[in-house]
């Protein structure tokens, strides 16, 4: 019997457990905590069989390229976005994350990887899996090159249906 876990901003559906930020549940020896997001929904911290998995959902440092705003307006918006991003990540400060799924969204423009780089540098997940880049697969390799040598292994997806495996230790 499959159970789906989503944020509480979606309609009620069969086999769906809805969670809001701050809630925690246990299902089949799996602990799930819903955490804040900087966009709609929530992010999830999942602990199962000694593995700690973080799924950011739509949480990101939404530092959009400057639009038609003044430089001052852009800088204010940028500061607010960074503060919201750092606050949303605060609950993870003591976690040792094995695998993190995190947006690397080229729609943001040249700042597409700022959230990912901040996350990797501050939380050092053992494995980092970029998401939300659609089929712009080169984005991942660009991120990997920017990071240089990192404690985190970046899994770059190169095609739909690609499978990865990870063994702790």
Give the role of each language-model region.
Residues 3-9, 54-57, 76-80, 99-105, ...:
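Active-site neighborhood of phospho(di)ester-bond hydrolases with catalytic His/Asp-centered motifs
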Residues 11-14, 40-42, 61-65, 106-112, ...:
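Active-site environment of divalent metal-dependent phosphoester hydrolases
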Residues 16-23, 112-169:
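Binuclear metal-ion centers of metallo-dependent hydrolases, dominated by the metallo-beta-lactamase
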Residues 2-3, 14, 30, 51, ...:
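A structural micro-motif
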Residues 1, 93-95, 119-124:
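Short, conserved loop/helix-junction motifs that constitute active-site signature segments
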Residues 14-96, 160-169:
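Core dinuclear metal-dependent hydrolase active-site scaffold
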Residues 2-12, 20-23:
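Short, polar loop motifs at secondary-structure junctions
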Residues 84-90, 109-118:
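A short, acidic, amphipathic alpha-helical segment used as a generic capping/interface helix at domain edges
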